[in-house]
Each structure stands twice: as C-alpha cells, then as structure tokens.
Amino acid sequence: MKDSHQTIGVFVRPTHHQNPLFSELTQAKEWVLRLLEDEGFESFMADDNGLKDERLIEKAYAFLCLGGDGTILGALRMMHSYNKPCFGVRMGNLGYLTAIELNELKDFLQNLKHNKIKLEEHLALEGRIEEISFYAINEIVITRKEALGILDIEACVSHTPFNTYKGDGLIIATPLGSTAYNLSAHGPIVHALNQSYVLTPLCDFSLTQRPLVLGAEFCLSFCANKDALVIIDGQATYDLKANQKLYIQKSPTTTKLLQKNSRDYFKVLKEKLLWGESSSKKN
C-alpha cells in the first residue's frame, strides 16, 4: 500500500449539468484523475457533502480542489477538523486562494512528491450559537434577517462590552478573508499570515464607526436586538435569535494551504487588485 503522502482526495465544484461549465469541469476532473495516477498518486473523489468514510480522509495527505475560491472554501471547512491541507486548481473566476492553473498541475505534483511545496497555515474562526458550532475560513457575517430596519449588534471582547453597531450588520473576518467580503465593505487588508480578527461594520448608521483589527488572543461575543442571520464564508447560514449569543474565537486548528514555493503574497495582491495599473487598464 502506498503511504499517505501519495494519496490525494479530489473535490470538484458542484455544477448542474445545464451549467456551461459542466462539460469543462467533467473533462478536467477526468484528466486530473488520470494525471494523479500517472504521477504515482492514489486518489479518491469527495462528493458535494464531503466524505462519509473517515478512513479515506485519514489516509489522504492532502485534498485537491478543482474550481474557484468557493470550492476551496467549502473543502477547507469540511476538512478543517481533520487538519488536512488543501490546494486549489483554478477553474473559476477570481482564484485568490487557488494555488495553480490547470496547466501547472503536473509540475506541482512533481514538486509535491519531492517536498518542494510550501505549507501555509492561516488563522480560522470557530463560532458557536448555543449547542451549534462551526468553522469559518474567510469570515462570519451577522446581518439583518428582515429587509427593513436597523440591526443593533452589541459586541463584547472577553465578556466586556465595547461597542454597539447599528446598521445592516457586521463582518468578522480572518486575515485570509480580509481580501474577500471585508474588502468590498471597505475593511482593511491584513497580511494573510497575521494572527488577528477584522471587524468591519456594514452600512453603519453612525459616521464614527470604523473597521477594527483585534489580536486573535481575544474571545468575542455578539448579540442582536432582533432576529438575525449568521453567514459563514458566504456558503452556510444559521439563525441568531434576538438577544441570543454568538461566540467567536480563534480555532485551535489552522487553515492549511499548499502553495508553490514561488508564490509571493504581495505579488498576488498586486495582480488581483490591479495595483499600479493605470485607470484605463482597470476599466
């Protein structure tokens, strides 16, 4: 039997057969599985709901995610409690988290076999609403459940009240997620390997409210004055009843991403955010 370093689990972006990407993803998946075999790796597929056989998860060294950032976010959350690294092969639009393009996979796998790949470990969030617990890779968002009215969110740091946000909601982002929804809401970019939380209000009623960066050693709690929604990485939702507590802390397990040794964080920012480009090129 091959050792765990030679076993790769494969996640593929869930796509309906009528989606224009369905045929492309199906062909890419088949090509990836053949390539893994040619390069000496054992492989197995994970379905949309993850894996029911924990023996396969334990056997795998890492998980290949074929799709965009949404695919890898879902896979990272599924695998978080198993402490397994993931790497993304871009088949989506943005591809901020994905490590490589499809045509780079062969070289990436060869480097993986020879330990010429770097492992990045990022802070993840652990949230809890009463008996329900969950992980977030990018962010946890508290937002209005009803279309009308202002949501009041009381925020506490280590059980001490420090602010009340009045508006559409609040983003609690990881450094890795600071370039996602947080950035769209005019929150700050925090280096992806930092150990901190980013709190960014959504359309706050007060002009004095500003985003806040807190050290990850703090435990946070939030409650709202009316029923609200808690959204995890833009992919999962939970109900937060009026005056019910949402607790957030640093997860004891990190988010693990395999990346090329040549990947440079600031170069990625420059490319994805078009820094240094003229306004005509951006448009």
Swiss-Prot record:
Reactions performed catalytically: NAD(+) + ATP = ADP + NADP(+) + H(+)
Cofactor(s) the protein requires to work: a divalent metal cation
Gene: nadK
Summary of the function given for this chain in its UniProt record: Involved in the regulation of the intracellular balance of NAD and NADP, and is a key enzyme in the biosynthesis of NADP. Catalyzes specifically the phosphorylation on 2'-hydroxyl of the adenosine moiety of NAD to yield NADP.
HAMAP family: NAD_kinase
NAD among keywords: yes
GO molecular function list: ATP binding; metal ion binding; NAD binding; NAD+ kinase activity
Protein name per Swiss-Prot or TrEMBL: NAD kinase
Pfam hit, one: NAD_kinase_C
Family, similarity comment: Belongs to the NAD kinase family.
Organism: Helicobacter acinonychis (strain Sheeba)
Highest taxon, organism lineage: Bacteria
GO terms of biological process kind: NAD metabolic process; NADP biosynthetic process
Residues reported in the UniProt entry to bind NAD(+): D69, G70, N138, E139, K166, D168, L176, T179, A180, Y181, N182, L183, S184, Q235
Compartments, record wording: Cytoplasm
EC number: 2.7.1.23
